[in-house]
Design a protein with these regions (language model features):
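DNA major-groove recognition helix of helix-turn-helix
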Residues: 44, 54, 73
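Short amphipathic recognition helices of helix-turn-helix/homeodomain-type DNA-binding modules
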Residues: 69-78
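Recognition helix of helix-turn-helix/homeodomain-like DNA-binding domains
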Residues: 34-50
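Short coil turns linking two alpha-helices in DNA-binding domains
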Residues: 25, 36-37, 51, 65
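DNA major-groove recognition helix of helix-turn-helix/homeodomain DNA-binding modules
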Residues: 53-68
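Alpha-helical residues within the helix-turn-helix
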Residues: 20, 31, 60
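A short, Lys/Arg-rich alpha-helix, primarily the initiator
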Residues: 1-24, 28
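Residues in the helix-turn-helix
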Residues: 28, 39, 68
Length: 78
């Protein structure tokens, strides 16, 4: 069983992979995440800097499902 922090790490990895699959631009990711203007510019330079809260907002906005997330994590979804 994964610990909560480990789950968060897997979640972030999965969402970043999924974003690449949907070919979303960094600008779209930043807007969807609801970043403040100053933060937005840092995020578009390096999407790895998105926080877990911002990434979760993107899951909801783009309706990423578990099977899609799992496939990009390289694990079997149940």
């Amino acid at each position: 069983m994964l610990k909560p922090k480990e789950m968060d790490a897997y979640l972030m990895k999965a969402i970043k992979g999924t974003a690449g699959y949907f070919k979303l631009s960094p600008e779209e990711l930043a807007r969807t995440a609801g970043c403040k203007k100053a933060t937005w510019y840092r995020r578009i330079k390096n999407p790895e800097n998105f926080t877990l809260r911002e990434l979760r907002r993107m899951i909801i906005r783009y309706s990423w499902d578990a099977s899609t997330v799992c496939s990009f994590m390289g694990v079997e979804g149940k």
